[in-house]
Amino acid sequence: MARFVVVPLLVLLSLFGLEAIQHPPKIQVYSRYPADNGKPNFLNCYVSGFHPSDIEVDLLKNGKKIEKVEHSDLSFSKDWSFYLLYYTEFTPNEKDEYACRVSHVTFSTPKTVKWDRNM
């Protein structure tokens, strides 16, 4: 009889344990093609390895949110951490600065990662 109570209790405790685990996202900002001023390209922000799944991602141009942004569906890895890809079309030039800003429960303030055109 005790076995019938203990097993469901252990299952419930393990599920609650999954919610308690928090992993900060890894943020990678890159362009689809090598940067070439004046030529259309895609700006990508790949956010991976995070848990829980609640996350806010913004692509920025000169510190301002880019409105026309698309993203992949939220997916998870074998370790149950999540990943997403945010992307938008853009045309790089010498004066504009691009970045990805991420808000997640593991960050006390949003984290911003700049696009390095030489990567």
Swiss-Prot record:
Q: Which GO BP terms sit in this record? A: antigen processing and presentation of peptide antigen via MHC class I; immune response
Task: Write down the Pfam families for this protein, in alphabetical order.
Answer: C1-set
Annotated signal sequence is 1-20
Compartments (UniProt record):
Secreted
Query: GO cellular component terms?
Result: extracellular region; MHC class I protein complex
Q: Which InterPro entries match?
A: B2Microglobulin, Ig-like_dom, Ig-like_dom_sf, Ig-like_fold, Ig/MHC_CS, Ig_C1-set, MHC/Immunoglobulin
Q: Which UniProt keywords apply?
A: Disulfide bond, Immunity, Immunoglobulin domain, MHC I, Secreted, Signal
Q: What does the subunit comment say?
A: Heterodimer of an alpha chain and a beta chain. Beta-2-microglobulin is the beta-chain of major histocompatibility complex class I molecules.
What PANTHER family does UniProt report for this protein, alphabetically? BETA-2-MICROGLOBULIN, MHC CLASS II-RELATED
Q: Which family does it belong to?
A: Belongs to the beta-2-microglobulin family.
Protein name per the record: Beta-2-microglobulin
Species name: Saguinus bicolor bicolor
Annotated gene? B2M
